[in-house]
Amino acid sequence: MIMVRRRQRPAKEAASSSSGGASSGSGIPVDQALPLNVAGNLLEDQYFASPKRKDCRLMKVTQNGQLPEATMMAHNKDNKAGRTIGVPLATRSQTRTIENFFKANAAAKDSQKTIHTEEQLNLGNQELKLDDEELNGQIKLDDEVLKLADKQINENLPFADEVDAKAEQKLMDEELQQVVEELLFDGSSRASSNSPFYQHDMDVMQEIQQTPEIPHIKKVTEPLEGLGSLADFQTHRSALRDSHSSTHSSSTDNIFLQEPVLTLDIDRTPTKASSIKINRSFELAGAVFSSPPSVLNACLNGRFNQIVSLNGQKEALDLPHFDLDQHDSSSCDSGVACGLTANTESPAGQPRRRKPATPHRILCPSPIKTALKVTGGICKVGSADPLSPRKSPRKLPTTTAAVAACKSRRRLNQPKPQAPYQPQLQKPPSQQQQQQQDDIVVVLDDDDDEGDDEDDVRALIKAAEERENQNKAPATANSNKAGMKTMLKPAPVKSKTKSKGPTKGQPPLPLAATNGNREMTDFFPVRRSVRKTKTAVKEEWMRGLEQAVLEERCDGLQVRHFMGKGRGVVADRPFKRNEFVVEYVGDLISIGEAAEREKRYALDENAGCYMYYFKHKSQQYCIDATVDTGKLGRLINHSRAGNLMTKVVLIKQRPHLVLLAKDDIEPGEELTYDYGDRSKESLLHHPWLAF
């Protein structure tokens, strides 16, 4: 055994020397009392030994009691002459190595002693078996042979004890040498394979693995029980001492004392500096707008970053001027895209109209009627104004007067027939006003025929004659205005309401009579919508169902006989989905009366199932069609995957059950619907309800 022992104090010299002498005189016999006493003294000395004391030495148990007093006093005086543990100031990690070593050695020696004792027991058992065989073979042997065999067995036991004592002494010497080498080498680390501690652990593991399995143990002697309790006591005291120590883990268990195993490889190479370029001008690179930019973008020009071309070239784009139309014809729903698209010049230099903003086109009245009203309504002769009552703004180009003059126009001045247009006023107006009122210009397109020109002249003459007849009446101050209105709006106003276009045998109205405007319906017919709302379609469908019920309609049906079912109904013509097929006709009764009829029908085995229960407006009803009335609705069979469905139709405050096509039905297909009865009693009497 090896222990760490503090040098004995003078007060305890007698006790320690007497105990040491007793132990040395008698040697170390293997019995029950001696190991326990030695272990107790050893653990007690270890518990009170300080790891940082310089007077701690390594010694054997047998040498502890044999030290003379002079030697002990010399060691007390000269501490430096002795052999210290490791370094002058031993740390906790170094002393823990010794403690762990003691634990491992104690466990190894216990296992070795157990192995030796078990081997001896096995040897004795084998000899006993041989003796038993000899006794069985030689029944007539005397009792003296048995005594000799027992004597031989008893002689083997002291011999085994002596062998154990020598082996133990040899192990103690080897362990002492290993501990000294460990302390000099600082072999507390198990990381290196050259460490003595590592090699000792490997040897112990190999010895444990090489131990043979013991087949059977009959007895456990008292010394083995003492050694087992010794190991338990040593482990308990060592754990108790560790619980009171300052540190609870060795350097290898403490994560803060371990070497780092993870390293972070961070790329610290400098990156290229990114640059941001701010443009102070509104620049576009070949952008094509489907609509002109808003005014807000023009106001924010030069304040925010805009689109920059990829090649880095900056080309300023001059934004064109857009005229905002304020009249009604520029609405988005009107189909006119003048206010929503940009006019891009074509290669020929002529303006090209783009696709309207909305996919549909709604016909609106002529813009001349919605524009601002002009006082005279007619143009002066020889004026350079490109607009005229005949031309609307959407037909005129928006460039210059030279472009407008490209279109040939023919102006007809009729000064002679215009004389009767002026009424006789009480006070003659001035010459300038009279000249403005006398000048009436009628503008016609080149595509008008020569016959239209003659009709216009005749219309002017006729209007002049009517004007003369009106002037015969007493003229007043307001007659001039009324006359001008009647001249500008004659009888064609009535023709608008009478007919949409020219009737047969009646010539078209002259342009002068309508102030140079034609009706929109002369060129485009009025589009009438034939679409219906969902509510209107449903109402029409319900009216059709009511009409079919009132007519008791049952066409397209045929009665056939089916094997295992009886009679059934087959479609004789195709039926569309949700189309009326037939009505389930019977007696409409209450629930109470239906219960009484069921009891009465239960007595008749031949009575079928013809009672249909349904709910309408939170009230239960029943239609009893048990009585054969010749209606086909009662003959339609059951199927959980039927092609008909029921619907309640209310006619004159009375609910009716009608059968509608659930899907498209082809001719020759059997008509079925789901009865909906899933009760156990019904399935017991009518199993076909499950299919």
Swiss-Prot record:
Question: Membrane-spanning residues where?
Answer: none
Decide whether keyword Disulfide bond is in the record. no
Location(s) in or outside the cell: Nucleus; Chromosome
Q: Which residues bind S-adenosyl-L-methionine?
A: 565-567, 610, 637-638
Q: Which reaction does it catalyse?
A: L-lysyl(20)-[histone H4] + S-adenosyl-L-methionine = N(6)-methyl-L-lysyl(20)-[histone H4] + S-adenosyl-L-homocysteine + H(+)
Query: Which residue ranges does the record assign to the SET domain?
Result: 555-676
- Which GO biological-process labels does this protein carry? cell division; chromosome condensation; DNA damage checkpoint signaling; heterochromatin formation; methylation; regulation of DNA damage response, signal transduction by p53 class mediator; regulation of transcription by RNA polymerase II
Q: Which PANTHER family match?
A: N-LYSINE METHYLTRANSFERASE KMT5A
What biological function has been recorded for the protein in this entry?
Answer: Histone methyltransferase that specifically monomethylates 'Lys-20' of histone H4. H4 'Lys-20' monomethylation is enriched during mitosis and represents a specific tag for epigenetic transcriptional repression. Mainly functions in euchromatin regions, thereby playing a central role in the silencing of euchromatic genes. Required for cell proliferation, possibly by contributing to the maintenance of proper higher-order structure of DNA and chromosome condensation during mitosis.
Q: State the protein's name.
A: Histone-lysine N-methyltransferase Set8
Query: What species does this protein belong to?
Result: Drosophila melanogaster (Fruit fly)
